[in-house]
Amino acid sequence: MAETADVIIIGAGVQGASLAFHLARRGVSVLVLERDAVAAGATGRSSGFVRMHYDLESEARLAWASFPYFRDWSDRVGAGDCGFVRTGFLQLVPHGLAEALRINTAMLQRLGVTTDVVGPSEVARLVPGAVVEDIGAAAYEPDSGYADPSGTAFGFLAAARRDGARLHQGCRVTAVAVAGDRVTGVRSDQGDFGAPIVVDVAGAWAGQLAATVGVEVPLEPWRHDTAYFGRPAGHGAAFPVVLDHAHEMYFRPEGDELILLGLESGNTVGGSPDRPMEALKQATIEEMVTRICARLPWMATGTLRTAHGGQDGLTPDQRPILEQVGPDGFYLACGFSGTGFKTAPAIGACLAELILDGRTTSEDISAYTLARFQAGRHLVGEHPYGNLWR
């Protein structure tokens, strides 16, 4: 007899884990099916930023609603450790985007976020040794920082399993099963599983699974590369997480010895999500060094420690799809486009409300529909920065 549940979640990254937690705590029978291992996909390669600065208010609200989970993990989740480190966060923009940043920061302040616009001199104080002449303005969030993405996913799942959720790793779902106009479960390489509700949280593979129920999702696999560099001696001082629009990169401290660095440009979009994750090309590493040294000249004597590539699903507007679509009981939660970690706690809560109550009450996710792409209504902030990490 096939194993059954009230809800099957396909994917055990941080989004699937958060949803499992929120459903299980409400007494729902949850089965999580993961093709590889917990956090083995985009989550395990995430840089773990915890920040609220977005140019789209609904996205900022999701990040703001998620923040208390990271800050108060033991009280809110009570299992595992998300590893949150409060470093502060800086959003750096060139002169041409300074006014947009001021308006977006005012929007965040209206939501209740502790954040201010600061100038180059304050950036130089917060990031010792930084070149600041090209900075038009910066937004500073003193309470933000970074967390451990894998630890966050494992913690959510530990809490979900404490409340009765089940997890199968190494279980590759091949199709969503449908009878008439209703979902009945899934087919996998470990057999069939039954449920009246299936949530596709399969990251870069989400589009393939949606296609098995006739739902076409504009989702492309997107590779993102990150590297850890050793800091030179004498440069172990703390500094904030930084999104640097001028140099199209981001970086953050890892303890007092390392810097994690990623680039926005030059990443591969398209192809098969099953392609092997090859090592970073030497040209990519050299470009990383060039850009970080342009902002932090003292990194010229830094040393590469390790580097890796990961992948996520990218939508045309680089924002997720969160809704019921296609046959009754089929839900999409995909297309996070590399920025889903920091919003995962609130999105899990919203999806649980949508599934169980038919509507969301904590935050409004009604704009995150699949139909927006067909209608040409891409989600874009009123004052966008015009690049991937927004």
Where are these regions (language model features)?
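Short beta-strand to alpha-helix junction loop
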Residues: 61, 91-100, 140-158, 277-284
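Dinucleotide-binding Rossmann-like beta1-alpha1 core, especially the glycine-rich loop
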Residues: 48-126, 248-250
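Active-site lid/adjacent beta-loop-alpha segment flanking the redox-cofactor pocket in flavoenzymes
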Residues: 216, 231-329
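C-terminal catalytic lobe of FAD-dependent flavoproteins
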Residues: 290-390
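Beta1/beta-strand and adjacent pyrophosphate-binding region of the FAD-binding site
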Residues: 2-13, 31
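Helical element adjacent to the flavin cofactor pocket in flavoenzyme catalytic cores
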Residues: 140-194
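Glycine-rich FAD pyrophosphate-binding loop
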Residues: 24-43
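Central helical "cap/lid" subdomain
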Residues: 192-240
